[in-house]
Amino acid sequence: LEDINTKLKERAGELNIEIDIFQSNSEAEIIEKIQSLTSDFTIINPAAFTHSSVAIRDSLVAKKIRFIEVHLSNVFARESFRKNSFFSDVAVGVISGLGPEGYIAALNYINQSEKISR
């Protein structure tokens, strides 16, 4: 996780993007973080909550935050229950199976998207 965070910070610096990295295994803490966000775009790896948390999904939708869903592993190459996501249909995009590079790809997309929308 530290390596991913370091790479993200480095890339964000190159793109002149301010980022806030947050990780929690607590559904309540994740929801509180989402509710406190001031940006309109985020990257989320919901991990096991992908298949179980309507509450996290609802908080993203209620806050009207555009987001990219990222998974380190290819969830479609794993157990069948992992193919169901409560987030994918409301995400701007989904990146799955690219390992840590998925986060960099998401950050690059956000950078490009924000340039276009200005």
Where do the model's predicted regions map?
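Short beta->alpha linker loops
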Residues: 25-26, 48, 98
